[in-house]
Amino acid sequence: MDYQPNNKALPAGSLGGLIGNWLNNNPWLRDESIIKGVYKDKLTASLDKADKNINSTVSRKLLNGDRNIENIASLLDNWVDNHPWAHGGWVPGNVDWDEFITNLDQSDAGANPIQQVREEIMELVRVLLETVSGKTAVEIGMGRCGGSHYLWSLMFDRVVTVDVDEKLIERFKYEHMPSSKQSTFIFGKSFENNIADEVGRATHHCDFMLIDGDHSRDAVETDWRTYNHLVEPGGIIAFHDTIKVVPGELEVAGFVQDLESGAVTGNPVPMRHIHKSKFVGISYYTV
């Protein structure tokens, strides 16, 4: 990626100096040409102008020619390979649900930095890069490590995330310092009216939505009915875990099938499926 380095020295004791030291010594920022280069220059450029809290100034979004699938894949691989505490790698695509659950490591160290199969999520990234503007993304459910929020922040000006676990949100904010201008986190149950109202205040519309919260059939339908109106024409609504139905555990596929057949609204919804694994999968449609 091409970028213009900022060579202006920052005093060692300044906020900029401290952040530069953090970037240089952070164990999981390994790709210097992409992460340290781009983000450190963004940080120092902003902090040269004003000594502000980093959370209020710096967007992770890749701009212009840098916003391509190769750079996003490289950054996401770095996220997975060098996460500070979650070392479970990508979700495996070649195992079935029963085997996955039997061998699941519930510890922090065993967590997947992003709860996705690589081939599936990168195919969705390709679709998004080709079809949507990259203005605003809304996701219902952020996962244990916030990997999907991190991914969308590379691609969109604004990312609004709703999750029921406040501790996960606060941990992500503490560890990764997302820009408050780019990232909005809403804590609560997505189906509650006050949470839906808060999402509506955060953004009146979006060009991408991922529904990946409670995986019960009724909850998925409620999330879809509550939030689908936010997605503008030409935008994309995606669902995660759409291959396998496991009663009481994975019921997203049942709703997606009903939506596709017309059983939900009376009109069939043309659905595209990214199914490159045994039990995970992503399905989406264009509004």
Where are these regions (language model features)?
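A short alpha-helical cap/connector motif
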Residues: M1-L210, D214-V287
